[in-house]
Structure formats: C-alpha cells, structure tokens
Amino acid sequence: MQVVGVRIEMPSNQPIVLLKEIDGVRFLPIWVGAVEATAIAFAQQGVIPPRPLTHDLMQDIVESLDATLTAVQVTAIEEGVFMASLLIRNSEGNAVSVSARPSDAIALALRTHSNILADSDLLDNVGIEIPEDVAQDALNASGESSEMERFREFLDQINPEDFAG
C-alpha cells in the first residue's frame, strides 16, 4: 500500500489517512486522530522536529534494540475500528508481531521506510474502488483539476459507518 495522504472528512472535520494499493485500484480510508494525522503528514513531507515526537521515539527504540521494522500490516476492522500489526525482526533474527493502531503503524512505517501492507480479506470487504481517471488525478501532484474535485467530493461523502464491516 502507499500513503496517498492525510485528508479531512467533511462535515465532521475528522482526519483520514488514505492508502492505495500499489498494483491495484482499491483505496483504504482509515479515520485517525489529529495528532497521528500530523505525525503522518510530517513524515510524508520530511519534516524533522527539533525534538523527537512519539513516533520518532518509537523508531529510536526499535533501532537501539538492534531490531528492524520489516513492515506494518492493517489486519482487520472490528466494530468500525481498524487493527494493525508491527512486523519486527529482533536482534536474534526472530520475527515478532506487535499489535498497534494503524495510524501509529503508518507513521512509524513512513519514518523507517518500511512496507505498508493490508490484509487481502480486509481490502475485499472495505476497500473502495475509485475510477481510474479520478484516482490518477488524486495521485498526480501537478495541480487541481475537476477530477481531483470529484475525488474530494467522494471523500467528503464517505463516513466511518461505511466500514462497520
């Protein structure tokens, strides 16, 4: 998955992180808190704060333990709440899975340049297919267009209840 970006869902002003399949057409919108949305946006934009934020601290802890974050995976949705796991290889080479909120997992993955995965059953159940022309405009950073506006309107119309699973 790739992080398309952080958006604000209207009219609730709730931040969402929008993930997209790398080799597909499905999107996965995940509602997140404002602090986590900021942490994700900072990582996407390469903003380095003067002091470590929580996710920077998490990265430092993993690295200081001679471990590696190999990937993060959005695994499920339960009662409208997304679940995720951090996939870590520890100093002895053992694979360890740690439960996490998707927002924290994504923020950490962006900082460590780790893969972001989504369970295929989850994408089958709650992934959203967006028409190719609209999706391409959303991923194209060259400027505003009517297609981008249509994409934003689509985002404005979806809500967390659509993903109650």
State each model region's role.
Residues 1-165:
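Divalent-cation
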